[in-house]
From Swiss-Prot:
Provenance organism: Streptomyces coelicolor (strain ATCC BAA-471 / A3(2) / M145)
Any single Gene Ontology cellular-component annotation: plasma membrane
Protein name: Diacetylchitobiose uptake system permease protein DasC
Subcellular location per the Swiss-Prot or TrEMBL entry: Cell membrane
Taxonomic lineage of the native organism: Bacteria, Bacillati, Actinomycetota, Actinomycetes, Kitasatosporales
Ranges in coiled-coil conformation: none
Domain ABC transmembrane type-1: 70-261
Keyword annotations from UniProtKB, A to Z: Cell membrane, Membrane, Sugar transport, Transmembrane, Transmembrane helix, Transport
Function: Part of the ABC transporter complex DasABC-MsiK involved in N,N'-diacetylchitobiose ((GlcNAc)2) uptake. Responsible for the translocation of the substrate across the membrane.
Length: 276
């Protein structure tokens, strides 16, 4: 039975409206960053910038400690993602391949940790960091970001490991590989989509995190970009062009990562949910 014209059109119209609603704020942020100040404060909105200027980006990048915030964000984010992947590879393999007492309890524990609201634990984390004399340090940020990422990473990679036929691993071991060599040469290459999807999730989570760094790092030398952006009125006042330029610079790494990995990341998330 053929669907009516409305039945064929409305899903597309809805998708277009949602797309515009989601993309327009991002477009407006980048467009404002390139507009001259006169166009930004004009009573008549300038939808498409014609006079392109990079002055706002210069103002943002020349702000105090800007590059310190950038380097701090990159350090804690990359380290947290890499450490979580290394640990998750071992943990996901153990949960998917090995049978041991308490295995289901571990899986339930990781699920509960994934659902836990980390914001309510900020005060407890602050007390731990304070008692360890590690305030205003990047080390606790890296460790706790890794803990935030780890449950999702383990559960997702577990699905990928479980989907790899055991016969492939056994064939490699028959050919003379140890179990570690079989994992590295056979299983690890097949986990590439899962590694990409979990890497993207971990990068976005750590890159955008604010409550923890707001509490444990009070000195500018140990703060990250999200905290710097929250103080834009103090830094830039009413200079909305510089504010949008700073926000654009903050968003660019995530956009690049998403565009580069989005196909494999989406296929990785769906494939990792099939079996496990």
């Amino acid at each position: 039975m053929k669907r009516s014209l409305f039945g064929r059109v409305w899903p597309n119209v809805t998708a277009v409206v949602l797309f515009i609603g989601l993309v327009f704020p991002v477009y407006w942020m980048f467009a404002t960053a390139f507009k001259p100040t006169g166009d930004i404060i004009s009573e008549n909105p300038v939808w498409f910038p014609t006079d392109i200027t990079f002055e706002h980006f210069k103002t943002a990048t020349e702000a105090d400690h800007f590059w310190t915030y950038v380097s701090n964000s990159l350090i804690v984010t990359v380290c947290a993602v890499v450490f979580s992947l290394v640990i998750a590879l071992a943990g996901s393999f153990a949960l998917a391949r090995m049978r041991f007492k308490g295995r289901r309890g571990f899986i339930v524990g990781f699920m509960l940790a994934q659902m836990a609201p980390w914001e309510v634990m900020v005060i407890a984390i602050y007390m731990i960091v304070r008692d360890a004399s590690m305030l205003n340090s990047l080390v606790p940020l890296t460790l706790f970001y890794m803990m935030m990422i780890l449950p999702f990473t383990i559960l997702t990679l577990r699905g990928f490991v479980a989907a790899v036929p055991k016969e492939l691993e056994e064939s490699a071991m028959v050919d003379g590989c140890t179990r570690a060599q079989a994992f590295r040469r056979v299983i690890l290459p097949l986990l590439a989509p899962g590694l990409m999807s979990t890497s993207m999730f971990g990068f976005i989570t750590a890159w955008n995190e604010l409550p923890l760094v707001l509490v444990v790092n009070k000195e500018a030398e140990s703060q990250t970009l999200p905290l710097w952006l929250t103080s834009f009125q103090t830094v830039f006042g009413d200079n909305w062009g510089a504010t949008m330029a700073a926000s654009s610079l903050f968003a660019i790494p995530i956009l690049i990562l998403f565009v580069y990995l989005q196909r494999k990341a989406v296929s990785g998330l769906t494939a990792g949910a099939v079996k496990g």
